[in-house]
Amino acid sequence: MGKTIADILERNNIPYMITFGTLLGAVRHKGFIPWDDDFDMFLFDESYDKAMEALSRELPSDMFLETKDSEPLYFHGFSHVKDIKTVTACAQFPHDGLYEHKGLSIDLYRAVRMDEGLLDKYLITEHIAYLGRRFRINSIDKNVYEAKVKELETQLHDLQIKETGKELLAMALAERSMKIEHVFPLKKISFEDTEFYGPADADGLLTAFYGDYMQLPTVEHRVPHYDNVIFIEAQ
């Protein structure tokens, strides 16, 4: 799936990079982390819509582009590509089970370039919007929703916003941001038997994300994303 998506993006001159556990796997394991079956990509805000158009047009029939336009119960702040030949279960993220398509998923995160002084405002605003989408589809209790939104609106009101002139890359709902110099210029990095685009400074980015990222986690923290995967035979 990842190779198919990357081929479409590269053919349409749309920048992307592997990130999070996928990037960590590429550097530390030269591919998938043995206990991690997830796949993560960053797309960039200025070309995100173009990427969705290209994927919608060119993905094969056994993959589904899950967006706010194609999934009625959509609540994420980013899109996914789902494998329709599989069905998964994930106790860690039970709300994902609300979606019609429950197959293996590739996350297409949206990286937004902004002044670092605007980061907190952006993250709080996006969190409020996320809770609103969850509330709209009845996946969050009304009292919990109202209490969380009130708390976030108070934080937003109390912010001291001052632009610094220094830019970074942010992602909605993530506690991490990325330094521009860690990301650009993008460069190819090996993953299993394929090369994907990754950041300019993978070591710097992974250190910022995870600290001593070459140190393996303890056995109890080696938890797969999916609890179960069922492969559907072709009809």
Language model segments and positions:
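Active-site nucleotide-donor binding segment shared across nucleotidyl transfer reactions
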Residues: 6-39, 48
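A short secondary-structure junction signal
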Residues: 117-123
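Short hydrophobic/aromatic beta-strand micro-patches
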Residues: 42-44
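C-terminal, low-complexity/hydrophilic appendages and adjacent surface loops
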Residues: 123-124, 181
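Conserved catalytic core of two-metal-ion nucleotidyltransferases
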Residues: 1-12, 55-116, 137-209, 216-235
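A contiguous, mid-domain pocket- or channel-lining segment that forms the substrate-recognition surface
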Residues: 127-128
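Short, conserved charged micro-motifs
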Residues: 49-53
